[in-house]
């Protein structure tokens, strides 16, 4: 059985937002750490900690709250998995999609590592489109 770790972390973050949880615990791998770093850098996640328990590493994510409203709703955003193990989607640097005219981000896996669509266009690189966030 093939485990899709990217889909698992996106689903756990999405479910935590829908259930109005503040903290999410996900399994730590190189891919998940790089995706979480991008989410943290782009402001979708408030804080990240690495936790070790019985020879297993976990990432503990504090989700971003919308502090501008009086009734403190969670900061809402959408996560969508694009390329999956059964159907890989690749794009060159000219054909990387723009989400809402640049308001959202696309996370790609390139030969230089996992990066956002803006970084990939800046370096002139394409790759596998992992997911979209808006």
From Swiss-Prot:
A single cellular component GO annotation: ribosome
SUPFAM superfamilies found in the cross-reference section: Ribosomal protein S8
Record key words, sorted: Chloroplast, Plastid, Ribonucleoprotein, Ribosomal protein, RNA-binding, rRNA-binding
Gene3D superfamilies attached to this UniProt entry: 3.30.1370.30, 3.30.1490.10
Listed GO biological process terms: translation
Localization per record: Plastid, Chloroplast
Entry GO MF terms: rRNA binding; structural constituent of ribosome
InterPro entries xrefs: Ribosomal_uS8 (IPR000630), Ribosomal_uS8_CS (IPR047863), Ribosomal_uS8_sf (IPR035987)
Chief place where the protein resides: plastid
Family per record: Belongs to the universal ribosomal protein uS8 family.
Function as written in the Swiss-Prot or TrEMBL entry: One of the primary rRNA binding proteins, it binds directly to 16S rRNA central domain where it helps coordinate assembly of the platform of the 30S subunit.
Subunit structure of this chain's protein: Part of the 30S ribosomal subunit.
Protein known as: Small ribosomal subunit protein uS8c
Species whose genome carries this gene: Jasminum nudiflorum
């Amino acid at each position: 059985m093939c485990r899709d770790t990217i889909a698992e972390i996106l689903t756990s973050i999405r479910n935590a937002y829908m259930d109005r949880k503040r903290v999410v615990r996900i399994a730590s791998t190189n891919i998940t750490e790089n995706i979480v770093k991008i989410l943290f850098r782009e402001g979708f996640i408030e804080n990240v900690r690495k936790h070790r328990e019985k020879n297993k590493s976990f990432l503990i994510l504090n989700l971003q709250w919308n502090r501008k409203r009086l009734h403190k709703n969670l900061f809402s955003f959408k996560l969508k998995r694009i390329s999956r193990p059964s159907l890989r989607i690749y794009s060159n640097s000219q054909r990387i999609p723009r989400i809402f005219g640049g308001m959202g981000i696309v996370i790609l896996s390139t030969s230089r590592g996992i990066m956002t669509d803006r970084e990939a266009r800046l370096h002139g690189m394409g790759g596998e489109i992992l997911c979209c966030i808006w």
